[in-house]
Amino acid sequence: MASSFIVVPFAPAHLPALADLWVATWARTMPEIDFEARRPWLLEHIAKLHGQGAETHVALDAPAGAPAGFVIIDPNTGYLDQLAVAPAHWGQGAAEALMAAAQHRAPAGIALDVNQDNPRAVAFYQKLGFTIASAGQNPMSGRAIWRMEWRPAA
């Protein structure tokens, strides 16, 4: 069932729900990794990114008002650090709404890193016009990643 989403700027009150959502999303995507153990890292990482100028935008499920997902984008560099959508909202438009917000904040282009073994995410970004620019390795997990980039149409 499709939902409608409202994208709002991050507020500190969102943080506990966003951390829960991030853990649940990644636990579903890569169950072999203990993302609950990475929760403290996420909280510190978000604070660090915000201190460096990045912004978090939150997709709220319009009927319920609960966070359905979030995106962290640095409008100065165009680097998208996090995109997470609760599994209950996969395929309902939350990720697209969040990416539209990111593209609005970084209209010159966006770069991101995605795990090569996350075909759902790779296909999603390709559907939005992202292309693979290079290969690398995630410094935390050691997993192979793609650097993907989006540029607006000329």
Language-model region placement:
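Acetyl-CoA-dependent GNAT
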Residues: 9-88, 99-101, 105
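Terminal substrate-recognition subdomain of acyl/acetyltransferases
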Residues: 147-154
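Conserved active-site alpha-helix within GNAT-family acetyltransferase domains
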Residues: 96, 117-134, 140-144
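Conserved GNAT acetyl-CoA-binding A-motif
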Residues: 105-117
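Active-site acidic-Proline motif in GNAT/NAT acetyltransferases
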Residues: 86-88, 92, 116-117
